[in-house]
């Protein structure tokens, strides 16, 4: 109820007067008082999972070391409303320090924006193809988080979602998505993925990577600077559009550009070099003024790590 009140503050007084049946109906967790699959996924007890067979209400967190070896794991089940918090607390959100020119005092940021972690997990829950009977995976590596869910990416293109910045016309699990929206778990207004990109931009980190092959969605969030010139460019050029940054992100990741993308970046003198070995222009990534970020990142672990 607290989440629902936060989402709909104008109904706060009425919410306190609703009995449980009324509240669950209003939150779209039940339908005319009857239990739905969405209610079992989000609020059900762990032993209730068999009612939605062959679906699995499971999120697996897996920790890997720098060599790719498994170090630890945890599997959380129903209720997924609470499982998200349990998985989130497992992830080690280390501190990054960056040093500005003209000062000896470092500034610290979290390696990952909390919103990005939660949005990625909740998107997996909302868009998982539960008919395939698979788990949602959260894989934690030294400098990356990987989130996977089964099922195709219905909008077709991540760039399309970001560019349109509007609600999707169709969802795989419409009733579940509505319930999660009402509980403030996801943003069905179409801005969640875009916000993830913007948070990475603010850190000067690589943008989220989406792999839509093999009938699944795999999202990789990188928690470090990959290319110093990319970081310098973002720090110095606040006027760059998100579309331009997405293209520069492809350059730093050595991903191929099509002819239109190449021409666009060359015309604006954002890249140099010859195909396929493009790199970010030295001019746009030139040294920064004192007030801007010096691209010197130091990863540090917390005292309790």
What is each stretch, according to the model?
Residues 1-134, 140, 148, 153-169, ...:
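Active-site helix-to-loop segments that bind/position phosphate- or nucleotide-bearing substrates
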Residues 14-20, 65, 70-72, 85, ...:
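Acidic-enriched, low-complexity/disordered segments with a strong bias for Aspartate over Glutamate
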Residues 37, 57, 157-159, 165-256, ...:
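Flexible, glycine-/charge-rich segments associated with ATP-binding catalytic modules
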Residues 51-52, 134-143, 207-220:
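Conserved C-terminal helix/linker of AAA+ ATPases
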Residues 145-150, 221:
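Conserved DxG motif in ATP/Mg2+-binding regions
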């Amino acid at each position: 109820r607290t989440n629902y009140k936060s989402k709909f503050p104008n109904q706060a007084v009425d919410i306190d007067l609703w009995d449980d049946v009324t509240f669950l109906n209003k939150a779209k967790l039940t339908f005319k008082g009857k239990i739905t699959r969405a209610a079992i996924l989000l609020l059900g007890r762990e032993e209730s999972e068999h009612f939605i067979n062959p679906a699995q209400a499971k999120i697996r967190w897996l920790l890997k070391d720098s060599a790719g070896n498994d170090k630890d794991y945890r599997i959380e089940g129903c209720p997924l409303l609470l499982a998200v918090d349990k998985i989130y607390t497992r992830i080690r959100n280390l501190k990054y320090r960056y040093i500005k020119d003209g000062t000896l005092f470092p500034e610290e940021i979290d390696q990952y924006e909390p919103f990005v972690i939660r949005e990625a997990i909740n998107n997996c829950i909302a868009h998982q193809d539960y008919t395939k009977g698979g788990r949602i995976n959260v894989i934690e590596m030294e400098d990356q988080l990987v989130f996977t869910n089964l099922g195709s990416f219905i909008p077709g293109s991540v760039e399309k979602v970001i560019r349109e910045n509007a609600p999707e016309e169709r969802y795989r699990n419409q009733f579940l998505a509505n319930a999660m929206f009402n509980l403030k778990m996801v943003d069905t207004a179409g801005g969640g993925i875009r916000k993830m990109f913007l948070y990475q931009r603010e850190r000067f980190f690589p943008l989220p990577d989406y792999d839509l092959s093999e009938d699944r969605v795999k999202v990789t969030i990188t928690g470090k600077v990959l290319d110093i010139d990319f970081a310098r460019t973002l720090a110095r050029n606040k006027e760059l559009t998100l579309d331009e940054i997405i293209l520069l992100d492809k350059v730093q990741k050595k991903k191929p550009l099509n002819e239109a993308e190449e021409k666009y970046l060359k015309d604006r003198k954002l890249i140099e070099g010859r195909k396929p070995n493009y790199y970010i222009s030295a001019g746009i990534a030139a040294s920064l003024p004192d007030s801007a970020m010096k691209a010197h990142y130091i990863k540090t672990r917390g005292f309790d790590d």
